[in-house]
Amino acid sequence: MALRYVVHDEISGFDQLKPEEYEVPQKLNPGEVLVKLKAASLNYRDLIITKGLYPLPLQLPVVPGSDGAGIIEKVGEDVEGFEKGDSVVCNFFTNYLDGTPTDFATHSALGGTRDGCFQKYAVLPAHALVHAPKNLSFEEIATLPCAAVTAWNGLFGSKEHQVKPGNNVLVLGTGGVSTFALQFALAAGANVTVTSSSDEKLEFAKKLGATHTINYKKTPQWASPALKMTNGVGYHHVIEVGGEKTLPQSIACLAKDGMISMIGFVASEGTTPNLTSIIGQILNRNANIRGIFVGSVSMFRDMVACIEAKDIHPVVDKVFPFDQLKEAYEYQWSQAHIGKVVLKID
């Protein structure tokens, strides 16, 4: 017997997060492996699923947890490239291997339409696995599937608009995706501006290498000073995690032919922007706006190569023991974290 967490409904919130016993799977189908999970990390998505706020496909009851890493315990038939004892991490979409995502691919999300990683053992398809970076701990590896791959896709997923040395990159916030975007953009030789409502978090961003920072609480109309920081050129890439409240300003400081990667909607809702004005700004800047829905196994492998080559280490804010998942959810919900919140499983 082993322990796992299960989300049973969308109304009980974090109170339903209690360890439950289950039988460790022994039979594997061809192409499957049994992974003994060592660590997992939290995402905003995991939190809102328990509160009925998740707008995408969901099949309850489900073991939550979008991110996880561990060691292969058992290998099924017809598995190539992996063997018992390998350290691995699973892609968020288990059926998104490469290219343009399909409905089939995006309906294979860990912790949503199939059981996730807040459990001791998980059966996973081998085609969704990636060999873990050799330079990272399991707590660090577990932060990669959602936040890191999303940031990587936002910066490098469009062949026509990959970030280049000397580009200006605007990163909103200092959560998981934003922190990875800062690190990857710097590794590519870009100039990076970071926004946050916390001077403490902005100081941390500077320590990571941020070129400029803006406190949007002190400067609510931050687009103009952000633009000045680029000498009027604007930003070639914007990592946009705010949504309705921040998008108009992101567009206002975009460079000509710049790319906005739409990733989230974590900012409090603002007044609905004047759509005609927004369209005018998009046209004026020849703007590119691209929705980012995590990424593929192929992107994950490319990202791991970069992490190893540049010795990039994820920012882990706090690690909780396995029996304190509810406390971990509450901590992340408070938005006190910088980078990632991790659950140590074993």
Swiss-Prot record:
Pfam families: ADH_N, ADH_zinc_N. GO terms for cellular component: cytosol. Keywords: Cytoplasm, Oxidoreductase. SMART domains: PKS_ER. Gene3D superfamilies: Medium-chain alcohol dehydrogenases, catalytic domain, NAD(P)-binding Rossmann-like Domain. Belongs to the zinc-containing alcohol dehydrogenase family. Quinone oxidoreductase subfamily. This is Zinc-type alcohol dehydrogenase-like protein C1773.06c. It comes from Schizosaccharomyces pombe (strain 972 / ATCC 24843) (Fission yeast).
